[in-house]
Structures are given as C-alpha cells and as structure tokens.
C-alpha cells in the first residue's frame, strides 16, 4: 500500500505551532499505527527540522490489504475532517502498490510507527499569545540503512525543554 500526504499548510515550528496545523509525519503514523502485519518498505517526510511537515509518504506491506485500506481510509477521513479549517488544501492518497525490495520486520515496523506516533509533537504550553514550549517532528528520512527522525524541541524554560526531550528519549 502506498500512502501519500501532501498540500498541508505547514509553517515555521517556532512561530506557527499554535495554529493546530497538521504535521504530515505525525499523521502518517496515525494512519499506520496498529495495522495488522504492517511491514515498512519506505518511509519519508518533511524537509526541515524547524518546519511543520507538509508532506510524507510510505510504502508498506500488510497482512490483509483490503482490511488495512478500509481502516486507513477511515482514519484518513478523520484527519481531513478535523483539519479542514487549518489545512484546506491537504490531501491524503491511499492506493495499492507493489514493491520488490526489502521490507522491515513486523516488530521493527511496529516499533518505528509507534515511536513516531507517540513522540511529542505540537504546542505544549502557551501564555497569552506567546509560545512557551513546543516540539515538532520535522524530518523522517529512510536511507535504507537507517530511519532518522529529526525533532525540534523549543522552550523558554530550560526544565520544560529537558522534560520534553526526556519524554522523546524514553520513547525511542
């Protein structure tokens, strides 16, 4: 199955994280979490650590293609409905695909998707109009030897920044 997320509004993660815009990387994990028999073939998204990801895509193998596509399409509609005001141009395509290369094991694939799904992402604390603490999953990069997730954690309070970093570290 190939999933392609594109056209989301994005923005600078330090100045626009409070706009509740969709992060395509986080949403990709939301589409794939707990899908039976999932094995990752390819996984990529975002372009800058400090930018809210506007694009992401995955090619995955699943145990039951028909059932997986049905579940993913249901989640897709949820994401698009909840983001229609903040990301009206966002698109998510889900289609059958073939892939002849290697795929990751089910366990490793599940761990990677769960990691992305649970990483802190978005506004954490705001005071009046000022963003105090936030985090952003900016880049998801599959180099075939490793999958890298780049996240940026910001805070005006050091202990809050270290807290967000500790949460992320414990997930990974």
Please provide the spans of the model-predicted regions.
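Redox- and metal-dependent alpha/beta enzyme cores, enriched for Fe-S-associated oxidoreductases
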Residues: 157-172
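Midchain, well-structured core segments that form catalytic/ion-binding scaffolds
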Residues: 1-154
